Amino acid sequence: MRHYIFSLFVISLSFSQNLQIRVVGKMQMDIPVLGPFKMTFDQTVAPGFLKAEEKIEAERFYAGWLMNGETGEIMIDGTEKILKYDKDEEEYWLQSPEDYFKEPDTSSDDTKSVSFSFSSDDEDDTPPIFTRTGGKEIESVHGFRTKKWITTIAFSEEKMMVFEEWFVDKLPLMRLSDSLESAIKTKFNPDQDTVELEQFDFSSNIFIREMDSLTTLKPIPGHAVKINFLVYEESDDPKMAVGFEILELYAEPVDTGYFVIPEIYERIEND
């Protein structure tokens, strides 16, 4: 049995050496002040290579002025710095691993985080009510065979969070992609024990785990490939809406020529 498991591990490792994994996803948000905007990410990773691009599009003018852009980064094992680039400006620059992995300044306005809270004029300590439906029918979402779940966390009759989630049982290509991404980033940052990967995770499972003493619901097993997160407060229209979905996830033979930028890009110093 041990020999069989070891053989499977060797086959899997050899299999990944000849492949690159591409994942394309989209996040849409409609939040107070900024309004609606969309972020698309496109990442391809192979053994010793990583290329990631991100595009942000906001509908409101002032939000677009602050946020719109299309940027990318490339990591190649054996090089000393990370290549960063701006597709709109057709410019690129080099960034040291020290700056790349530096802890972000959370006090800065240039942080990609969103927070929200429920307003309340009373001192009602009633615990939230958790309900969940679904998980029976198979639905196809971008080629994934999923089961849809709807989880509601109600703080009152007018204040609640609703999660619409499409889960698959397993997503082995995503696990392989995360493993390859972690490996290349660890090589650029060897002094850190573990490298944190950017994850778009705001599923109901987070709230279930954090509030497990208040509910008998268990985290949904598997991997979410699509999530709609809605916050309601004294209105039939959501106060905030966030959507995330994986549009593409596939493996193909490694093409090292993909991990480059156009020759017309101009190098700049970007401190």
Show where each model-derived region lies.
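Positively charged n-region of N-terminal signal peptides that target proteins for export
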Residues: 1-4, 143
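Sec-dependent N-terminal signal peptides
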Residues: 3-13
